[in-house]
Amino acid sequence: METKQTYSFDEAFQASLAYFGGDELAARVWVNKYAMKDSFGNIYEKSPEQMHWRIANEIARIENKYKNPLTAQEVFDLLDHFRYIIPAGSPMTGIGNNYQVASLSNCFVIGLDGNADSYGAIMRIDEEQVQLMKRRGGVGHDLTHIRPKGSPVNNSALTSTGLVPFMERYSNSTREVAQDGRRGALMLSVSIKHPDSEAFIDAKMEEGKVTGANVSVKITDEFMQAVVEDKTYVQQFPTNSSEPSVTKEISAKALWEKIVHNAWKSAEPGVLFWDTIIRESIPDCYADLGFQTVSTNPCGEIPLCPYDSCRLLSLNLYSYVIDPFTDHARFDMELFKRHAQLAQRLMDDIIDLEMEKIDLIMSKIKTDPQVDEVKSAEYHLWEKIKKKSCQGRRTGVGITAEGDMIAAMGLRYGTQEATDFSVDIHRALALNAYRSSVTMAQERGAFEIYDAKREEKNPFILRLKEADGQLYEDMKKYGRRNIACLTIAPTGTTSLMTQTTSGIEPVFMPVYKRRRKVNPNDTDVHVDFVDEVGDSFEEYIVYHRKFLTWMEVNGIDTQKKYSQEEIDELVKRSPYYKATANDVDWLMKVRMQGEIQKWVDHSISVTVNLPNQVDEELVNKLYVEAWRSGCKGCTIYRDGSRSGVMISVSKKDKTKDEKPVDEEKAKDLNSAEEHHEHICNHPNVIEVRPKELECDVVRFQNNKEKWVAFVGLLEGYPYEIFTGLQDDEEGIALPKSVTKGKIIKQTAEDGSHRYDFQFENKRGYKTTVEGLSEKFNPEYWNYAKLISGVLRYRMPIDHVIKLVGSLQLKNESINTWKNGVERALKKYVVDGTSASGLKCPVCGQETLVYQEGRLICTNCGASRCG
């Protein structure tokens, strides 16, 4: 067997850094996530160029099976430098990669036929979910078939528990599989007509519950009409039965207000406008043949029937703008149309490659050492997926860089002019993707259940007919290769490599600030900050890559170090002004999604980002507007509504008495300066941990055991925490007089890391305790890593304490340990910080503040130890 060359991480990183023009984040993401590796971590690709040749050669191999094949060079030219066509993560990693037995599909939906709410059926779905996740797939499934709480059952429980406990089961399975590099992503959905839908909507409001799943409610037009008209609504089970066993009359408006409140408070549930999805769905023209849509993938952009799957690919819209950011910028529509047809063709080739991967998976299952009774469920699962994939040959051609394309054309995201332009682009994409699918039907054959008669009244097909009559006639004559073709996904890390905005979204921030450690004796650096241990740091501005291009095109010095005021002025002059994720016109963004949705046969994944201080009424308006505009789904995120997510830093502290954004301002969209601090004033995050950190030593009792916590400090702020037993043969022997020291990160020759603690004794001699992490119970160590992660990214300490307190842990010992960690961290809370959400146990008022690590009531003076 041929021995392939391997590369060290540094070799691959340096080569990729040059490939991406010095973009460290893009290079690091590519090496970590997409470079071909084996199970031992050996790296077989030095740069994305080698990856693109790997993909091009495999696609060309498939092309040679059919008429008019593309060459490997032609495919490579489409992929090179992520310029035109970008396969999504699973295809990019898996195509031509024989070191992993994994699927090329990004998304799956599962669900059993018939009466599927028995324990056996629920366990089978749980198993199938895990089996798909371990092969890289994101999974969605619907819970509408589960009997509502209190329904009679023929087992020892006598009545059904309802669907919420099973949400937690499926969520925990996802969290379990999403470890050690495996992927876990889950969507759970339920119909608003289900009697337990309110419990489903509330399930994630309790901290620590259903944390491994996204949840969305399938909303019907009937329900929305009842909301608008403030009428009652009847829920029932089964939801589609003419003779339901359970009925329940509710106030539609009250339940809707709960959806709105929960979305405002925690960003979930998302809403799926289910009647719109089904009405527009081409696969549902074949519902009786097994293509009835039941749920979506985790991000919501691909509604699917059970056991169908989809692979994703994006066109980089920015690359089709000629002379970007100039007065004569124009979009190369002819090149785009040609590439849209080729993108659809490449997607069809990837289906053939996926069939090969599924065969490999099934072959591996057969040869696994387990007994057939264990293996048969997974084998049968992949049989069902292969059959459905062959029947429909579903694809997910989409786009990225919409926000940058709009800016490069001199338009402002969120205006009617920009929306009209985007609609033209997506109409062209739809017509040419479908044209390509018809051409492939002539050359390769139509998907096996194609029937023009079934589709003739479908609204999407009728729009194609109106826009291009010849395409429609050819489709009736020759058929179509793919049952559905289009989507718009959140392109995530792939947009880091295209160095553009993600998917259909606007730019998140055009400018932000980072800090790096420097040698103060180096004449080429400027020291902006010196920490308490004497380390020097230089602050530097990071520009969104296309904002930098705008500066260059307009003759603005990109090397100059600008003041905050100068940066503000630059942003105001640019096409990105009032067009970022947080200050775009929200209602126009929703309307834009609805307009574009008319030319996307699957769905669109979009998040509407809102400032922290908006009220629930705005969320209500956005959701109702999304329904009326023809969106298939909608998700909102209010800044700061989820702990652990970095929030915008306000110019002034927001108080409970501050008025929400009024309606007129919400319509007109105030500038970022009115609602949030400018983009450059986020907390500073040090990208690379310094080798040494100052450390506080905090001791506490865990049951009857003596424990010690080592709190690493950066700029006086907790950065990491280590915990372990004291005075034990396997623990940490430490004099009681030691209260401070240093945590030193050591790197071994093999690249692995360990953390040592060093302190000075009373005589001034240094003592080093090696390998802190090796001295801890792995369960405690994993929780300590979680806590260190949020500390590192500067979540406020009082929020970290709240997060630690919300951890749902298994036994008394680890819960006592958790309480000790909370006490250790409370000493770092700034005196006077309000303990939001906590009431004084004496007077019952919400007037507790932190003072010297204790909670003090400002109303009655009571105090208690943290």
Model-derived features with residue positions:
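Conserved, charged catalytic cores of large soluble enzymes
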Residues: 2-73, 155-169, 179-291, 322-326, ...
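Catalytic alpha/beta core of large soluble enzyme barrels
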Residues: 24, 294, 300-302, 354, ...
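Function-dense linear segments that define catalytic or interfacial modules
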Residues: 36, 58-65, 78-155, 163-166, ...
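Internal maturation/activation junctions in enzymes
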Residues: 76, 237-238, 339-386, 390, ...
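Short, Gly/Pro- and small/polar-rich lid/capping loops
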Residues: 472-474, 650-711
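Short cysteine-rich clusters marking metal-coordination/redox-active sites
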Residues: 840-843, 857
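Cys/His-rich microdomains that often coordinate metals
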Residues: 846-848, 863-864
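Cysteine-rich micro-motifs
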Residues: 853-863
